C-alpha cells in the first residue's frame, strides 16, 4: 500500500500535492471560488442526459431483481453439491447477492432524488418499496440525504461523515491509531455503522436533542415532514413482520443465509462508498466563513471500483456529477462526467486506488481536520492524522 505525503505551497488558493507512492500525485481541490458556474457546467452536458426515461429506469430494476431471483434459486440447489463445494457456494452467493442488492439500493436512492422518472409519485412508490425491502426508511433518509446534498463539505451543516477538528476528537481515538485499532474500527463501522447512523445518528451532524431516522419528531425533520416518517416506519414494520413470518416458516438460519448476510454486505458497501466519496486528504471542508454550495459540491471524490462501477450503477465513479446535478439518471452520469471534466479541470478529483486499499489508507490518514498553519485561510480545513 502506498504512503501518503503532503507537499504544501504557500499563498491563498494554493494547490498542495498529495503524493501516493507509485502513483501520480493528486492535487488538493482548489478552495477558491471556481471560475465557472453551475449554469456553464449544465450547458456543457448534452440535453438528453437530463431526461429521465421511465422505461429505461424500470429496465434496471427488472434486470437487478431478475438476477437477485436467479441467485436465490441457485441456493435451493446448494445442498446437492458435494463437500466442500456446498460450503464454498454460500460465501460466493453472499458476495454476489450483496453486490447486486447494493445496485438495487442505489436505484432506490435515485428515486429519492427524483431521478428515476418524471413522475414524483412513481419515484416515491418504487423507492419506498425497494428501500423498505432493504430495511431503509425511505422518506426519512431521503429528507436527511437531501440536506446532505444541500450542505456538502460544511462542517456546520452537513449530515453525515462530518469530520471533527482535533480539539473535538474523542479522547480514545489516539489509542485506535494503530493497525489493530484501525481494523477493529473499520470492522465495527462496516457492520453496524449504517444501522447505528439510522437509529442514533452516529457519525451524523450533531443535534441538540435525540436524532433518529425512525423518530417522526426528531430534530432532523420539520413539522410538514413528520407524516412521511410515519409512512417509512409503517413500511419498515411491514417488511420486518414479513421477515419474522418467513423466519418462523423457514428458520432463522435460512433467513440469515439467504437475506441477512447479503444485507450485511449491502450495508458495508454503502458505508464504504459514502465514506470514500467524501473522505480524502485532497478534499477540503469548510466552516461557515468559507463554505458555499458549489465549493462544497466539488469537495467530493470519484473512485474506481472496477467491474463494481457498473453493478453499483456508477454511483462510485460519477459522484461529482451527481452532486452537481442530482436529478440526472445514473445511465447518463458517465457521459455527463466526461462532458464537464474539461471545464472542472483541477476542481475534478478521481482516485483509482482499489477501494479496499483506499479504505485502509483513508482510515489511517484522515483522522481529523485542521486549517493549514501559517495561512489566512482559517475557514478551510484539511485532513490530518498526527496526534
Swiss-Prot record:
<comment type="pathway">
    <text>Lipid metabolism; polyunsaturated fatty acid biosynthesis.</text>
</comment>
<dbReference type="GO" id="GO:0006636">
    <property type="term" value="P:unsaturated fatty acid biosynthetic process"/>
</dbReference>
<dbReference type="GO" id="GO:0005789">
    <property type="term" value="C:endoplasmic reticulum membrane"/>
</dbReference>
<feature type="transmembrane region" description="Helical">
    <location>
        <begin position="183"/>
        <end position="203"/>
    </location>
</feature>
<keyword id="KW-0472">Membrane</keyword>
<feature type="transmembrane region" description="Helical">
    <location>
        <begin position="251"/>
        <end position="271"/>
    </location>
</feature>
<feature type="transmembrane region" description="Helical">
    <location>
        <begin position="227"/>
        <end position="247"/>
    </location>
</feature>
<keyword id="KW-0560">Oxidoreductase</keyword>
<keyword id="KW-0444">Lipid biosynthesis</keyword>
<dbReference type="Pfam" id="PF00487">
    <property type="entry name" value="FA_desaturase"/>
</dbReference>
<keyword id="KW-0443">Lipid metabolism</keyword>
<dbReference type="GO" id="GO:0016491">
    <property type="term" value="F:oxidoreductase activity"/>
</dbReference>
<feature type="short sequence motif" description="Histidine box-2">
    <location>
        <begin position="145"/>
        <end position="149"/>
    </location>
</feature>
<feature type="transmembrane region" description="Helical">
    <location>
        <begin position="121"/>
        <end position="141"/>
    </location>
</feature>
<feature type="short sequence motif" description="Histidine box-3">
    <location>
        <begin position="319"/>
        <end position="323"/>
    </location>
</feature>
<keyword id="KW-0275">Fatty acid biosynthesis</keyword>
<feature type="transmembrane region" description="Helical">
    <location>
        <begin position="87"/>
        <end position="107"/>
    </location>
</feature>
<keyword id="KW-0256">Endoplasmic reticulum</keyword>
<keyword id="KW-1133">Transmembrane helix</keyword>
<comment type="function">
    <text>ER (microsomal) omega-6 fatty acid desaturase introduces the second double bond in the biosynthesis of 18:3 fatty acids, important constituents of plant membranes. It is thought to use cytochrome b5 as an electron donor and to act on fatty acids esterified to phosphatidylcholine and, possibly, other phospholipids.</text>
</comment>
<dbReference type="InterPro" id="IPR012171">
    <property type="entry name" value="Fatty_acid_desaturase"/>
</dbReference>
<dbReference type="InterPro" id="IPR005804">
    <property type="entry name" value="FA_desaturase_dom"/>
</dbReference>
<feature type="transmembrane region" description="Helical">
    <location>
        <begin position="54"/>
        <end position="74"/>
    </location>
</feature>
<feature type="short sequence motif" description="Histidine box-1">
    <location>
        <begin position="109"/>
        <end position="113"/>
    </location>
</feature>
<keyword id="KW-0812">Transmembrane</keyword>
<protein>
    <recommendedName>
        <fullName>Omega-6 fatty acid desaturase, endoplasmic reticulum isozyme 1</fullName>
        <ecNumber>1.14.19.-</ecNumber>
    </recommendedName>
</protein>
<comment type="similarity">
    <text>Belongs to the fatty acid desaturase type 1 family.</text>
</comment>
<keyword id="KW-0276">Fatty acid metabolism</keyword>
